[in-house]
């Protein structure tokens, strides 16, 4: 039996910079749960093009909303070749009836809970249309089966999971739809063994909140200290309030953390169930975390209902005050299944159901206090200003300001700056923004416009 596991791209042919590539993990976990006599191939379309000359008996495709269209295209292509196709991931979990139109089977939830049944049913020619996977006990599953595809990045960084689930219930987030609102842990001993078996000293911890359960985090960080590893991950900003955990986090080898700042608008923050309710608290937390030797990488979202056009300059001012050298900037994206999608749908404010546009770059809804075009151009403005060449030069001292000085971290963050500049250029040259129209037309890739004879209008200056 020949099995293919695919992680698709929503922009086929556009490769991701090696320095910021997120190591694939989910498919390698499925591979570890597959019988040894199965010939397994893993393909990550962010790294290289899929080789359609190869034939497979069973194809599994992991599907996010932004990659749904591409996932369906790949599924149909392999079905025409005679393969059976299984779709899984957050998008099929939310919209299984849509997904099954393009596949032979759909998995709800975390596939580890039913993957053995899927493979067994396929072999016995009794593949079911739907498999509902219970939330798995993470202590019962082996380490990922690495080495089947390119699952490493710059500095031999590999993916690692210690927990799943998130106790927060943000209106715009789909994490709890897939993993639930209760944090589940892998036994610390299993995490340590996984690290030792990986052969790497550099890790990207893919948990949604690596410090979400202080007691577990303390045990984990203490166990990591003797291993001498380096890692980056994601945490809630409330970590700044627990100095003991913060100290252990740094001692365990943490070089940087991704934090959901979400907004620099006090009105927007007030509407969220966040531990910090003011920009002053956020700025104080940035300083505390960086004073502990951990670089702070913020995620900021534009387009909340309380945002006005002042939010764009306010965002740049916040980044300047905190001297943060990197950021992840996103347009608010109302994923299907989330509370915000249901609310905006009820208010007739969703303006695109093309899933490839749900990519954090594209405006797919009508904002409350500005037009879709104003939000799109404001997003472009912030991205372009922050990652301009002159701004990157100003960021360099900040790259070395977090002590102890970490040259590898500084190099990765510098590469993140150039990746951000590349994203700004992509937005500027590859997306077609609407002109003066009452209804926003979501952007298409320039090549698609050219193929249909359309002429992109281009981005106007702010």
Give the positions of each predicted feature:
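Acidic, low-complexity intrinsically disordered segments
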Residues: 1-199
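Hydrophobic anchor at the start of a short beta-strand
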Residues: 3, 40-41, 85, 203, ...
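Structural recognition of alpha->loop->beta junctions
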Residues: 98-117, 248-258, 314-329
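Radical SAM [4Fe-4S] cluster-binding motif and immediate context
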Residues: 143-297, 302-304, 308-317
């Amino acid at each position: 039996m020949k099995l293919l596991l695919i992680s698709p791209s929503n922009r086929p042919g556009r490769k991701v910079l090696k320095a910021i590539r997120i190591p694939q993990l989910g498919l390698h976990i499925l591979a570890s749960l597959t019988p040894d006599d199965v010939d397994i191939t893993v393909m990550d379309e962010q790294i290289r093009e899929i080789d359609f000359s190869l034939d497979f008996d069973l194809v599994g495709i992991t599907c996010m909303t932004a990659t749904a269209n591409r996932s369906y295209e790949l599924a149909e292509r392999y079905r025409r070749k005679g393969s059976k196709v299984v779709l899984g991931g957050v998008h099929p979990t939310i919209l299984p009836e849509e997904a099954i139109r393009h596949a032979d089977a759909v998995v709800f939830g975390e596939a580890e809970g039913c993957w053995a049944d899927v493979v067994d049913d396929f072999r016995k020619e009794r593949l079911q249309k739907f498999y509902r996977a219970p939330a798995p006990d993470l202590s019962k599953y082996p380490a990922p089966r690495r080495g089947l595809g390119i699952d490493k990045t710059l500095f031999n960084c590999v993916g690692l999971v210690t927990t799943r689930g998130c106790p927060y219930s943000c209106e715009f987030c789909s994490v709890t739809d897939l993993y639930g609102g209760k944090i589940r842990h892998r036994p610390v001993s299993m995490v340590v063994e996984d690290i030792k078996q990986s052969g790497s000293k550099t890790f990207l911890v893919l948990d949604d909140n690596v410090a979400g359960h202080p007691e577990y985090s303390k045990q984990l960080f203490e166990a990591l200290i003797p291993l001498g590893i380096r890692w980056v991950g994601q945490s809630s900003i409330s970590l700044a309030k627990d100095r003991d955990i913060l100290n252990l986090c740094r001692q365990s080898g943490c070089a940087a953390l991704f934090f959901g700042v979400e907004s620099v608008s006090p009105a927007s923050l007030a509407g969220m169930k966040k531990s910090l309710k003011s920009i002053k608290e956020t700025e104080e937390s940035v300083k505390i975390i960086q004073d502990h030797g951990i670089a702070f990488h913020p995620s900021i979202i534009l387009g909340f209902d309380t945002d006005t056009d002042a939010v764009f300059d306010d965002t740049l001012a916040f980044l300047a005050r905190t001297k943060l050298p990197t950021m992840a900037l996103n347009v608010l994206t109302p994923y299907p299944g989330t509370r915000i999608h249901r609310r905006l749908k009820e208010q007739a404010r969703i303006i695109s159901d093309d899933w490839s546009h749900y990519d954090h770059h594209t405006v797919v809804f009508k904002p409350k206090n500005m037009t879709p075009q104003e939000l799109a151009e404001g997003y472009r403005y912030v991205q372009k200003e922050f990652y301009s060449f002159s701004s990157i030069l100003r960021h360099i001292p900040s790259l070395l300001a977090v002590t102890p000085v970490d040259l590898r971290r500084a190099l990765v963050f510098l590469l993140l700056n150039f990746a951000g500049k590349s994203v700004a250029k992509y937005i500027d040259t590859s997306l077609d923004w609407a002109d003066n129209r009452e209804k926003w037309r979501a952007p298409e890739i320039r090549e698609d416009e050219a193929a249909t004879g359309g002429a992109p209008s281009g981005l106007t200056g702010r």
